[in-house]
Amino acid sequence: MKKIQKFVMAFLLGAMTLGFSACSDDNGVEEKFELPEIGQATTKINSSDKDMEKVTKNYVQNVVYPTYQALAANARTLYSASQTLYKAAEAGTMTQSHIDAACEAFKNTRREWERSEAFLFGSASDNELDPHIDSWPLDRKELKNALTSQTLIAGFKGDDPAKFVSENNTKFQSVLGFHGMEFVLFRNGKNRTAEALKANDTEEGMTSVKGIDELAFLQAVAADVKNITALLEFTWMGSAASNETKSVLSNASYVFTSLRYNGLAANGTMCYGQHLLSPSATTGYHSWQGTMNQIFIGGCDNICAEVADQKLGQAYRVATGNAGVTEDGERESIDYIESPYSHRSFIDYQDNIYSIKNSLYGTRDVNATTPAENSMMSLLKKMNYSGLNDLSNALNNAIQTLETAKNSGKSFVEEPGAQRVKDCIDAVSNLSEELNKAATWINLQDAI
């Protein structure tokens, strides 16, 4: 199931034949793949810049870029740890330390992804990279089919599992990404054991699945996540992306083949960083106020409302006898819980709110008590926004309420109807209200 998203604007996209090839030439020699040349964003702050422009430059340079770079770097580590784990299992030398290393790498990668969810607009949404690596709840039936298909298992164990996943994922699309990997690595809030992964799975309905095949799936999906997170970094940063990310994509040209405009913004003419910094009728951001509104509503409130209403709200409503109906006309489900196997739901949701804090404070320091000079919060203060304290208090309260739930000793999946869950819903909903108030106010101000 793809997560429900709302966006302030629709980017201008259309069908286009990609202007590069990684196919062999007439002599059977593979051509060198060249990444699209689209330059990089101009993020240097000048004294002549409008204040809203300074805020956006700081946001792009010091929040969005380093988050995607950390995500891509951690995904490379996750792939390496997953590959090492699979090869050790295949050789009969797997130890618990191999599993623990992969679990730790997973958690580090997951953290950066969750802390990017306040800016899912842009490449993650336009290129459908968000649902590609983060759809939930996990479809256990589809996962079982994938893990018992000899054809798919052979592909996961093949010479290029990342390419195999990229070209064949329609057969197991709903179990790609973080939640398929989570199922392999964690159960009941704990790392899987070496003994468990040396045998068949014991989960209900999965007893025909071999541990070695789960690990083959893990390293194949981790390879795909490595590519997708590199794509996120590159499409936002352009030529400013790290050499490691450029290397990953240069060796995986196939990830571009299903993307319109090479996955880039403004009909393939610029990276998403520059796109956000170019308010005009052409890019779709008609003014700096519109850019501010996109960050507040299309970014921060989009994830804030989802945490309250869906990530926390759906299972809570079912658990307390108030189940509703989804937009698809289906009954809400008690299983609509993110990260149930690792018991890290509250951690995920707090990281989502940290993503909002980082966006507003203009820094990736989640413990920051003072916003950066050119930040949303500093701009609101400079412009004498009367609701600034209410917004700040709502943000801090949402973080603290989730911290209390996280440290309660009970995970969300264990007690989805607990009062602590309602407390979190109320706190995050209040933050959503304050974000909307601030966005409405700033949209009416002059772009000083």
Predicted regions and their residues:
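Hydrophobic alpha-helical targeting segments used for export or membrane insertion
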Residues: 9-17
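Mature extracytoplasmic or organellar-lumen-exposed domains after removal of signal/transit peptides
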Residues: 33-448
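Bacterial N-terminal signal peptides that target proteins for export
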Residues: 1-9
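Bacterial signal peptide processing site
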Residues: 24-27
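A eukaryotic "domain-start" boundary segment
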Residues: 29-31
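C-terminal motif of bacterial Sec signal peptides marking the signal peptidase cleavage site
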Residues: 18-22
